[in-house]
């Protein structure tokens, strides 16, 4: 019954192709968790002059994004673990990013509620140490 709404072959309903295998997404083929299709759509929409975007380019960009996210989350998780808490906050993200030299140069954005890095100027430390020495000598 061609053209009807009966059980017919085709379409994405069963998610199987002609050989009976289930379809795999680009992300699954590349072994990624992030969605390659969505990244490709963003790349196509955000390029000038409606340039074409290859499938491999989208997979590559997705892999880079996934790697950077995993790196930041690992460092932020370590920062949270050091502070003996179980939830990653913007403060932990700030400490993780600013603590790593390469991520610090890559991510120059201001993180909301991230705070500042704990740092005391050397000139101030020298004055405090000199006062302690003077008190101990006297």
Swiss-Prot record:
One of its GO terms (molecular function) is RNA polymerase II cis-regulatory region sequence-specific DNA binding. Residues 1-32 are annotated as: Disordered. One of its GO terms (cellular component) is euchromatin. GO terms for biological process: CENP-A eviction from euchromatin; heterochromatin formation; nuclear-transcribed mRNA catabolic process, non-stop decay; regulation of transcription by RNA polymerase II; silent mating-type cassette heterochromatin formation; transcription elongation by RNA polymerase II. The modification N6-acetyllysine is found at residues 5, 12. Belongs to the histone H2A family. This is Histone H2A.Z. It comes from Aspergillus fumigatus (strain ATCC MYA-4609 / CBS 101355 / FGSC A1100 / Af293). The lineage of its organism: Eukaryota, Fungi, Dikarya, Ascomycota, Pezizomycotina.
